[in-house]
């Protein structure tokens, strides 16, 4: 992985989230990708499971903002800090997230593995 491909992936991730587009979000992942939303839950496995997750996000979040900062890139992994804010519907609860991604991309630029850690302010 290089910095440019990681930035491109992060930008696409942000656009998919802000656009509430589960198809675009799922397209960022390899067929057999894993997505670990929290360290305490089993990872989602496969693009179909990731699509289902993002479909739920699209139905329950509005006024989404997202930004990220690359912290480190190695040939195997990218690490980024990210921020998001949105209104959860229902009940109209304003939410802010501040988190860290650990990501590996395959040769085609799709995510093979994503692990995240985040904190929430509501």
Which residues are covered by each model-predicted region?
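Short, low-complexity N-terminal intrinsically disordered segments enriched in polar/charged residues
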Residues: 1-31
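A beta-strand edge to alpha-helix "cap/lid" segment located at domain peripheries
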Residues: 2-5, 21, 51-122
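Alpha-helix C-capping/helix-to-loop hinge sites
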Residues: 13-16, 36, 86
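Structured beta->alpha junctions
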Residues: 14, 39, 70-72
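Short hydrophobic/aromatic segments of transmembrane alpha-helices and their interfaces
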Residues: 32-34, 94
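A short gly/proline-enriched turn/hairpin at secondary-structure junctions
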Residues: 34-44, 56-58, 117
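A broad, structural micro-motif
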Residues: 44-45, 66
């Amino acid at each position: 992985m290089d910095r440019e491909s990681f930035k491109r992936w992060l930008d696409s991730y942000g656009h998919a989230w802000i656009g509430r587009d589960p198809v675009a979000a799922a397209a960022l992942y390899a067929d057999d990708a894993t997505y670990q939303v929290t360290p305490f839950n089993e990872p989602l496995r496969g693009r179909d499971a990731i699509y289902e997750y993002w479909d739920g996000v699209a139905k329950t979040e509005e006024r989404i903002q997202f930004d990220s900062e690359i912290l480190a890139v190695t040939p195997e992994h990218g690490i980024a800090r990210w921020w998001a804010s949105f209104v959860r519907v229902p009940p109209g609860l304003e939410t802010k997230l501040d988190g860290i991604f650990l990501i590996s991309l395959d040769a085609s630029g799709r995510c093979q593995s994503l692990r995240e850690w985040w904190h929430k302010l509501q």
